[in-house]
Amino acid sequence: MSQQTNVSVSAQTICKIGIYFALLVVSSKVAIPIPFYDYISLQTAFIFLIYPILGAKYGSWLTVLYLVSGLLGLPIFASGGGLGYIFKTTFGFLIAFTLMPFLAAVVRKGNKLFSHHQFLNTLVSNYICLIMDHLIGFAYKCFIIKFYIGDIINVTGILGFTSLLDFLIDVGLIFFVTLAELQIIKRIH
């Protein structure tokens, strides 16, 4: 006899996942291309709103669903979609998005540096996750540029400059996202 596993997901949770999926797609389309294989988009900032609201489990489901849907051909990423997107320099950031809910859960549990101040605690946790996201994204970008595109010159200074610009803009966005995140959490709990 086989054992049945009862998986119960509320209709409200399914609706939240659907709404946040649509909002994630919209946020990825709000993108400004910058030189040397990079984009500045609202997608990274929006990712930081998904996990606190949906939690690590459903946040992961959402990002995996987003990644798989894009790889299957839906044009939902910043510059399209399809299986060939794994050869885009920005695909590493999408990989990092799927890991972020678990990292965020671990970092937020372990971060007691500012336990008396919720904003600082959340901001530091978000910045740690942002650094992880950019490290994975930058490493993947360098790998693709060097081994797939074969452009060794851009892996140096100019690529570093555009990646730094992208990171600094994300640092500013995450500050405001943290403010919004705390307000949203306060209202839904």
Please provide the spans of the model-predicted regions.
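Hydrophobic transmembrane alpha-helices
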Residues: 2-62
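Helix-boundary and loop/linker segments of multi-pass membrane transporters
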Residues: 9-13, 37-38, 78, 82-83, ...
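Hydrophobic alpha-helical transmembrane segments
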Residues: 32-45, 66-76, 108-122, 180-184
